[in-house]
Amino acid sequence: MHAFFLLVFLWIAPGVLAQPATDTVASSSLPALHFNGQLAAWSGVQAAAVPVWMAGGRFVPTLTGSSKPGGRAVWDMETSLNINGSLGWSRDSLASYTGRIKPYRIWIRYSTSRFELRAGLQKMNFGAAKMLRPLMWFDGMDIRDPLQLTDGVYGLLSRYYFAGNATLWAWALAGNHRPKGYEWVGTARLKPELGGRVQLPAGPGEVGISYHYREADPRNSLIAGAAQYTRSSLAENRMGFDGKWDVGVGLWVEGSLTALEKDRQLLLPTRTDMLNLGMDYTFPLGNGLGLTLEYFRYHAGDRFFTGGAGANVLASMASYPLSLIDNVSVMTFCIPSPGRTLWMNYLSWSRTYDQLSVYLIGFISPEDIALPVMALQRGSNGFAGKGIQLMLSYNF
């Protein structure tokens, strides 16, 4: 609550202090506040020998504001909460229940035509891939989630936009000790994370190079037994690259290399490499059939590219608008492996009005296997096994 009032004050203060000492204040420089948000509810069932029913809800109230005290520069802000709860039950028992209230976004931004600086709890993502993203460093978005909600990170992000369409990013993060993205190990407390990114035009597209440094705390790990580890900090360097081009069809490449400081006591992989190759195209059939294809490789071990363990995933997504408000889509993930090929299949229908959206999702997947990215997401897997889910979302 103290952070909320501090944020509002920091946002209002520049506008107030910049006003002339007169009784009349120009209306264009007055802060403008808007309250909106999203309310969602869902229910579903996972078919099994004993079916498991699920129900849940989420409320994301959001306060936004903007002010233009100096004529050219803009101050704006956003603060929101994530209020959510869910239940899972079978015929004769309560399988699970969760409930939580936490900050979702709390940030303030200063921006001009070429520069912006944003501070606070914010969403940070970049890259070209659509379904399986090697550059998912700071978020946890799941392509199967119709709402596309994800936790943010606390930090400072600056971006400068050059005249030739190049963009320079720089960031400093702090207070994000829990594992995020693909991380197996959380970040050491009171240790800042630093990084940057350059995006450059490249013919009919663009390319990007990204770097991130942090000090990981091996005691804060998703692996059981890590709390017994003695060291509290290990250096980690991360490099990323991506490019996308429109040459009639959309083409992209995205990859990431992560090197964690080696230690004899460490039982975790110290090298991780990921690669995504993808394409998309809209076929002129009926209202337009959109098709997306991706190849994704995930590998972790003591060396890059060889040894250790890994997975190859073939992903496809087809989408077709039945009308102005109805859409159907199919997603398929294939994981080839010796002796067994795993398939994950999702069929969804959506209807979108001005403020209300309805989603109906059917899925057939292994009950005990998840994609590499999905396996790292904390919480239950609501799309495991066979089942169906209905979701309503209202935006106001």
Segment roles from a protein language model:
Residues 33, 71-77, 114-117, 165-168, ...:
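Repeated loop/turn-to-beta-strand initiation elements of outer-membrane beta-barrel proteins
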Residues 66-168, 173, 200, 367:
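Outer membrane beta-barrel
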Residues 61-67, 105-110, 156-160, 196-200, ...:
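Residues on the lipid-exposed face of transmembrane beta-strands in outer-membrane beta-barrel proteins
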Residues 356, 364, 380-396:
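Outer-membrane beta-barrel "beta-signal"
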Residues 23-48, 75-79, 166:
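Transmembrane beta-strand segments of Gram-negative outer membrane beta-barrel proteins
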Residues 41-47, 65-67, 81-87, 112-114, ...:
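Transmembrane beta-strands of outer-membrane beta-barrel pores
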Residues 244-335:
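Detector for outer-membrane/organellar transmembrane beta-barrel domains
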Residues 51-59, 99-104, 150-154, 190-194, ...:
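Residues that define the transmembrane beta-barrel architecture of outer-membrane proteins
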